């Protein structure tokens, strides 16, 4: 993807999570990028990023805040439900050059294959999270087909980095597992502990998205 402009105005929605923070840090020091980050303002941003404080799920507030800005690229890390995808399509239709939706490998059906690529069937009956992300993808594809909405979809695997270690069963955070290790207690694993599982370091996601 090559965009013919000297300085790109980039908006990250989210921007302070496991996947998004390293991307935010890299773009913030890139002289060719004018970086904006929209979130609720609970975490500090790196120098060079302009923060827009807003609740992404409050559509009226979001519309009111963003009417003062224009962007070339929007990357959203926090779409989980179809209605959020619809909101974003309606909000940015005809206004941007590229929209990047961070989806997940949990959309894929893993029953028929261990090693998968983009051709794998998307029908994960075991993950509501994956099913919802699939519905979001379908809405973005439909928008692309109907009126050329400039969508790019990225499907990371489970990601570890700053404050997360590569664990397959951990709950919302890693500390409970670390505490069990420190206390010489058994650690829960998926299956019999020998099954294949893939994870991605946050800097690998950074390379993919920043390019």
What spans do the regions from the language model cover?
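Flexible, glycine-rich beta-alpha linker
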Residues: 152-173
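N-terminal Rossmann NAD(P)H-binding glycine-rich loop of SDR-like oxidoreductase domains
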Residues: 8-30
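NAD(P)-cofactor binding segment of oxidoreductase domains
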Residues: 69-115, 131-142
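Active-site Tyr-X1-5-Lys
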Residues: 126-153, 182
């Amino acid at each position: 993807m090559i965009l013919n402009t000297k300085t790109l105005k980039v908006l990250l929605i989210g921007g302070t999570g496991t996947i998004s923070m390293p991307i935010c840090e890299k773009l913030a020091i890139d002289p060719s990028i004018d970086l904006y980050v929209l979130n609720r303002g609970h975490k500090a941003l790196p120098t060079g990023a302009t923060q827009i404080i807003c609740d992404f799920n409050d559509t009226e507030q979001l519309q009111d805040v963003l009417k003062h800005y224009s962007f070339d690229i929007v990357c959203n890390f926090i779409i989980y439900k179809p209605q959020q995808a619809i909101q974003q399509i309606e909000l940015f239709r005809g206004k941007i050059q590229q929209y990047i939706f961070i989806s997940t490998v949990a959309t894929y059906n893993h029953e028929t294959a261990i090693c998968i690529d983009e051709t794998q069937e998307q029908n994960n009956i075991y993950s509501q999270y994956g099913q919802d992300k699939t519905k979001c993808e379908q809405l973005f594809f439909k928008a692309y087909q109907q009126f050329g909405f400039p969508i790019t979809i990225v499907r990371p695997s489970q990601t570890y980095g700053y404050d997360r270690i590569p664990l397959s069963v951990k709950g919302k955070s890693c500390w409970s597992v670390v505490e069990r290790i420190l206390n010489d207690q058994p650690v829960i694993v998926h299956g019999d502990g020998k099954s294949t599982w893939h994870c991605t370091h946050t800097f690998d996601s950074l390379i993919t998205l920043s390019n």
